[in-house]
Design a protein with these regions (language model features):
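Bacterial signal peptide processing site
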Residues: 26-28
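Post-signal-peptide N-terminal segment of Sec-exported extracytoplasmic proteins
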Residues: 45-91, 98
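A short beta-turn/strand-edge loop motif at beta-sheet boundaries
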Residues: 169-175, 215
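C-terminal motif of bacterial Sec signal peptides marking the signal peptidase cleavage site
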Residues: 21-24
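Beta-strand signatures of extracellular beta-sandwich domains
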Residues: 178-182
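Transition segment at domain starts
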Residues: 97-104, 108-158
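Short, solvent-exposed, Trp/other aromatic-anchored flexible loops in extracytoplasmic proteins
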Residues: 187-227
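Bacterial N-terminal signal peptides that target proteins for export
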Residues: 2-12
Length: 227
């Protein structure tokens, strides 16, 4: 694991900040904002457990690493800020403003570098899942279960997946129906209300909906209940 930030490094960072030289630090300097992000990412990868799920386990692991790394950076910022307040207490308001303005910029840079890393690795995994089919079943009193299918079509946001559902009603369908995520024992996890145009019996229905990736990791089937 990469070296964690120690008290000596924090004090060195404050000293550099005091002279306004942080921007000129080399890339391999422990006080560089890029290094903050790199260390947080390494700490996350060493600390976060893998997620045992064939379809979305890697994406959930990446998201958990992102949250861990964000907290690692946030905790270090909090500690550093407290030491900075003590260090600059005798400086003028103008000097304090300039110092903390630079500190804010470096905070944003560290978070940005970290997010860029996880966005990139997430997108690589998302591409592999586009078009994947989900295990699905439908209400046989309302739909032809042999023609029911669901697949992943896109990832609209971090930890969000877009699903395309195809159903064929066996009787006239109104303008809405329910989709229920269930676990492997068919116990309900979460319902979604889907709106659609009324359909005739035998008329194919296609609906897209967004849902959290975390729910898919627990789901073995999707049930559709007309109403």
């Amino acid at each position: 694991m990469m070296k964690k930030f120690g008290k000596t490094n924090v004090l060195a960072f404050l000293a550099v900040m005091s002279f306004g030289l942080l921007a000129s630090c080399s890339q391999d300097n422990d006080n560089n904002p890029d290094k903050w992000a790199q260390d947080a990412i390494a700490m996350a990868e060493d600390s976060v457990e893998k997620v045992d799920n064939e379809m979305v386990g890697k994406l959930l692991y990446i998201d958990n690493c992102r949250q861990f790394a964000r907290k690692a950076i946030d905790d270090k910022i909090s500690d550093t800020y407290k030491e900075m307040e003590e260090k600059v207490k005798d400086k003028s308001d103008e000097e304090k403003w300039e110092l903390f303005k630079g500190f804010r910029t470096d905070i944003d840079s560290a978070f940005s570098k970290m997010d860029q890393h996880y966005d990139q690795v997430s997108q690589e995994e998302e591409k592999k899942l586009i078009g994947k089919s989900l295990k699905v079943a439908s209400d046989t009193q309302s739909f032809d279960n042999t023609k029911t299918k669901a697949e992943i079509v896109d990832f609209s946001h971090r930890s969000k997946v877009k699903i395309k559902v195809t159903l064929t009603p066996t009787k006239p369908l109104g303008n809405s129906f329910r989709m229920i995520l269930v676990d492997k024992d068919q116990k309900p996890i979460a319902p979604f209300a889907l709106m659609t145009m009324p359909k005739k019996a035998g008329e194919t229905l296609t609906v897209e909906t967004n849902g959290p990736i975390a729910l898919l990791a627990q789901t073995s089937m999707l049930l559709f209940d007309a109403r």
